[in-house]
Amino acid sequence: MEKPSDSKNSSISVNYFLNSAAYSGLFSLLSVILTGQVSATSSLCVGLALGVLSLFSRGSTVFIGGLIERSSTVSLTETGFGFIVFSLLLLQPAMGGFIGFLFLDLALLGLGLSLVNFALRGHIIARVKDKKSQAALFALVTMTANLGSAIGPLASNYIYKAFGQTLFVIVIVGLYVFSALLTPIVLTHHVFIRNEKSSKENTSSIVKTITDSLKSPGTVLAILAVFVGSIMNGQLFAGMALEFHSLSDSPVIRGLFYSIDAISVIALQMPVSKLISRGMANGQNATSFIIKSLGIYGISFALFACGVSSYWWICIISLAVFSIAECIYAPLINIALVEAQPDKPLVDILNYRLIIAAIGESAGSFLGGWIVPALRPAGMTAWYWCALALVGIIPAVVSNQIGKRGQRIIRR
């Protein structure tokens, strides 16, 4: 199969940039918008709404594998954009009506986001067969996506503050419409994402993979570590977003919180990856690094608890620490699950990973979207972040002590 031209590569990266800018801009304010218009009913409803969105945006494609295999990447991407635009246009009436309608609307939004992300990644894998070219293209689109993640929140917070919610939604919708129009030009037509095995075989084997995982302590440990890490990750666009919005009236500072996270990940990923490689060469496995990342998430939340009392600059420091944890956690999820179950089909492990991340991030979004608005009137949100800090730090400390004890026994 031919390598895509440089112009095609550049066009795909533009699409990634637009999607990332729209996504990060939308999610940096969505929890704030929902809290402002739905929390009058119940802060629990806000948490449930964010949980539904996270669940569908992370894991919905796992359950429509047959449809995905029968559709071209262009069709999948256009369908996803259609769902996104339609759901955003319905968002305002959905927030003012029956809460179940809001849940359905956010589920549709999540499905659209999931389809677009899955189809774009799948298109690159299916179209570019040369591994070096594939890696180079993924590096390019990751860089442009991170750039979009840095710019999107700054622009969105400025537009929201200066011109209001209606124009903000129009701009986000406009970005997705433009991306949809760009898709048939950017993507090669008649490209399909196909698995080597049939959907029936995949379905039966993933069920067996889940069942078998519960029989192995090592696998259960890896699953729990990944699950807790995904809960931590789910805080960024839920509880943390609500705190950011209340810390400053400046749209620049509000947007800066998210931009710092994106920029920090860009700057830190390579040096952190080198440290991980060195540790693995010395015998450490991926699960042990993920548990370490939980401790770093915990430190981040402990700092964040100190900052939410109005010291926004401490929150900036906590975000930099949060980014270090992301740099460790995100690249190692697949590796940890494969290490724990090396005899299982890779496609099942990848789907399994999506399910764990979807449930974990949904739980994190739900907790942040529910508890933070509930505790804020009493000025007690710091307790929530302290509790999360303990959830991350305790396993990391225990794991470290067990590791040291094991090394002493080996030396003796």
Describe the function of each predicted region.
Residues 1-9, 190-222:
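Juxtamembrane intracellular "pre-TM" segments in multi-pass secondary transporters
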Residues 2-54, 220-258:
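Helix-loop boundary and gating motifs at the non-cytosolic
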Residues 54-62, 149-150, 262-266, 270, ...:
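Residue-level signature of mid-helix packing/kink "hotspots" within the transmembrane helices
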Residues 60-72, 160, 268-285, 372:
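Helix-to-loop junctions at the C-terminal end of transmembrane segments
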Residues 82-97, 295-309:
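C-terminal ends and interior cores of transmembrane alpha-helices
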Residues 107-144:
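Cytoplasmic helix-loop-helix junction between adjacent transmembrane helices
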Residues 161-176, 372-392:
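A membrane-interface helix-boundary motif in multi-pass transporters
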Residues 344-375:
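A late C-terminal transmembrane helix in Major Facilitator Superfamily
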